[in-house]
């Protein structure tokens, strides 16, 4: 008999929940609401909201809008987006995650205080990611984005450095970057670093590893665009090599291998609970005779 368990700690983080609730609330009062970028990196959840009247646009689309309501998702936006909205008489529904908002303010304050002494502001994050674009915008585009240790060659270790992190990055990865910078800094040169990783995200790492290792087989459910999903999946697979990444229920087409009894279903901070529940139902259907 197959036993299927959904990880109670997986699913939307509070920032994503707030953004989706904001969209649903607005769509309850209007037929059309625009969202700048995918509200969440999960295509099925985006489709659900689009059926309610949500229209996803990019920055070019925003520049053409006038006199409309636009939702800013949890990832946050640079100051230039707010300036454009004001010029175009766009009403902003700001669903920026409070953790991201605090980080934006912290980086902006650091930039204002250190720009005169030529300090390098460095962000450990994914280049081009919406959150990172918003953070870089707080420095008038001057921040240096570091994705991996090898990128540190771009820094000048004879000049002061202030290091921040994208909120959804790996804590271990951040610690490794800090250690490497410390080792390379010229003697007497100032290096300040700030652990700005969201603990709701960071705490999922040990939890999801424990969850994965306690099952014979794991389905990790996430959107292909989710950075958090990719990171958590890799950790899941390290803990349990029998971990499969899926984005939709339709990807489960075969019964489980013989001998599998305990199956886990987990996901990213952008994975809706309803999708994990559908995956669990599908697993039971395909393995009903096992």
UniProtKB/Swiss-Prot annotation:
Superkingdom of origin organism: Bacteria
Known cofactor(s): [4Fe-4S] cluster
UniProt binding sites for isopentenyl diphosphate: 41, 75, 129, 226-228, 270
Note on cofactor: Binds 1 [4Fe-4S] cluster per subunit.
Gene3D superfamilies assigned to the protein according to its UniProt record, in alphabetical order: 3.40.50.11270, 4-hydroxy-3-methylbut-2-enyl diphosphate reductase, catalytic domain
Pathway annotation from the record: Isoprenoid biosynthesis; dimethylallyl diphosphate biosynthesis; dimethylallyl diphosphate from (2E)-4-hydroxy-3-methylbutenyl diphosphate: step 1/1; Isoprenoid biosynthesis; isopentenyl diphosphate biosynthesis via DXP pathway; isopentenyl diphosphate from 1-deoxy-D-xylulose 5-phosphate: step 6/6
Residue numbers annotated as active site: 131
Signal peptide location: none
Gene Ontology terms describing biological process: dimethylallyl diphosphate biosynthetic process; isopentenyl diphosphate biosynthetic process, methylerythritol 4-phosphate pathway; terpenoid biosynthetic process
Catalysed reactions, semicolon-separated: isopentenyl diphosphate + 2 oxidized [2Fe-2S]-[ferredoxin] + H2O = (2E)-4-hydroxy-3-methylbut-2-enyl diphosphate + 2 reduced [2Fe-2S]-[ferredoxin] + 2 H(+); dimethylallyl diphosphate + 2 oxidized [2Fe-2S]-[ferredoxin] + H2O = (2E)-4-hydroxy-3-methylbut-2-enyl diphosphate + 2 reduced [2Fe-2S]-[ferredoxin] + 2 H(+)
Keyword list, A-Z: 4Fe-4S, Iron, Iron-sulfur, Isoprene biosynthesis, Metal-binding, Oxidoreductase
Binding site for (2E)-4-hydroxy-3-methylbut-2-enyl diphosphate: 41, 75, 129, 167, 226-228, 270
Molecular function GO terms recorded: 4 iron, 4 sulfur cluster binding; 4-hydroxy-3-methylbut-2-enyl diphosphate reductase activity; metal ion binding
EC nos: 1.17.7.4
Disulfide bonds, paired cysteine numbers: none
Binding site for dimethylallyl diphosphate: 41, 75, 129, 226-228, 270
HAMAP family noted in UniProt: IspH
Its biological purpose: Catalyzes the conversion of 1-hydroxy-2-methyl-2-(E)-butenyl 4-diphosphate (HMBPP) into a mixture of isopentenyl diphosphate (IPP) and dimethylallyl diphosphate (DMAPP). Acts in the terminal step of the DOXP/MEP pathway for isoprenoid precursor biosynthesis.
Family: Belongs to the IspH family.
Name of the protein: 4-hydroxy-3-methylbut-2-enyl diphosphate reductase
Organism: Parabacteroides distasonis (strain ATCC 8503 / DSM 20701 / CIP 104284 / JCM 5825 / NCTC 11152)
Gene name of the record: ispH
């Amino acid at each position: 008999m197959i036993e299927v368990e959904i990880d109670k700690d997986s699913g939307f983080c509070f920032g994503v929940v707030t953004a989706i609730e904001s969209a649903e609330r607005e769509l309850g009062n209007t037929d059309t609401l625009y969202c700048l970028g995918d509200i969440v990196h999960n295509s099925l959840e985006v489709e659900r909201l689009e059926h309610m009247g949500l229209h996803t646009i990019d920055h070019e689309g925003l520049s053409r809008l006038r006199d409309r309501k636009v939702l800013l998702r949890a990832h946050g936006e640079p100051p230039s987006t707010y300036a454009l909205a004001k010029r175009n008489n766009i009403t902003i529904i700001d669903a920026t995650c409070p953790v991201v908002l605090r980080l934006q303010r912290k980086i902006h304050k650091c930039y204002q205080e250190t720009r005169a002494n030529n300090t390098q502001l460095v962000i450990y994050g994914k280049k081009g990611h919406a959150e990172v674009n918003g953070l870089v915008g707080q420095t008038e585009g001057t921040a240096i984005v570091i994705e991996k240790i090898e990128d540190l060659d771009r820094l000048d270790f004879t000049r002061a450095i202030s290091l921040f992190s994208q909120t959804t990055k790996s804590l271990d990865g951040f610690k490794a970057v800090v250690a490497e910078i410390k080792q390379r800094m010229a003697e007497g040169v100032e290096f300040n670093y700030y652990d700005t990783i969201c603990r709701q995200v960071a705490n999922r790492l040990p939890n999801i590893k424990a969850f994965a290792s306690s099952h014979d087989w794991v389905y990790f459910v996430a959107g292909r665009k989710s950075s958090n999903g990719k990171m958590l999946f890799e950790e899941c697979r390290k803990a349990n090599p029998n971990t499969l990444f899926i984005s939709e229920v339709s990807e489960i087409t075969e019964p489980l291998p013989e001998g599998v009894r305990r199956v886990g279903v987990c996901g990213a901070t952008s994975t809706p609970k309803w999708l994990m529940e559908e995956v669990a139902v599908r697993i039971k259907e395909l393995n009903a005779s096992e």
